[in-house]
């Protein structure tokens, strides 16, 4: 029988994080500690973290709902996926807790499946640790070349919104430490100043040397969006995230049809938690890419669904963290390694664990432009 304890923590940003929805100075998270009477002393930890004004489940009654869902999981012995589709951050926190519990259980029981032998799930079950149906994919989440410290995941450097001078300084810092893919959050200052910043980069670096991604966070007006996309396209931009605000499907579909540079949907996916609605969105808008954040887009279960549907339609994808602490970031990195591995080609939007003054220690480190697990 499983038991889940809930704790809270507020993390503090080293410097204010500017987004299109304001500036974050703190980050509030709930942590789930999962134990089982089948294996005393073994535990798994997951993080449930919403973003105010962005997450579809960032509601005043969140703490009460979280407690109720955890009690449900304790009684059922599994994650009731269909019942909690509207709560992606809770789904992801539970998945992370179970995945880290199973990983700890395998180490405690010294389970190392041989090739062609029984799966880790089967061996755990044989040793008295039940693996709920539909959750077998969580058992080996941390078992990959990345998880063993053998491979790194290429990530993009993120340049937050700020003044022209601040963004330029942050950009130069990212390039100096070795990033070859840089993402600029735009929309905070005059568009032509941001364009000038991009021009500065291209005056020095070709697209082969530095891949540029931009994130408009829905900041373009529909009537101006196409001309702004055309202006950006002159500088060999890899992609632009969410050029206009979400919930404008006909206009976004038109932009995706006529755009001179690839469009990636991000906020557009938030709150679209039912499979049939996901199909309708992808079939209507037909984006070039979708960007998946487990805390916002349905946890691992929901993101797997998005990736499957996107692949069927020839739509690309990558995975991004969403200002989680190292608990969430660690799980997202392992998930990206599983989904796109063993050799992850496309740079992922994973945080570096260096955003907060009081982050939770985790064996992750950046070497150049790659994220590694330290063994």
Regions from the PLM with identified roles:
Residues 184, 189-330, 334-336, 355-366:
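Catalytic core of soluble alpha/beta enzymes
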Residues 1-212, 217-219, 226, 233, ...:
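N-terminal capping/lid subdomain adjacent to the active-site entrance of alpha/beta enzymes
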Residues 339:
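A glycine- and small-aliphatic-rich helix-loop capping segment at beta-alpha/alpha-beta transitions
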Residues 9-12, 161, 269, 323, ...:
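Short, solvent-exposed coil/turn elements at secondary-structure transition points
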Residues 342-349:
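Short helix/strand-capping turn motifs
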Residues 48, 242, 350:
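Active-site donor-binding loop signature of nucleotide-sugar glycosyltransferases
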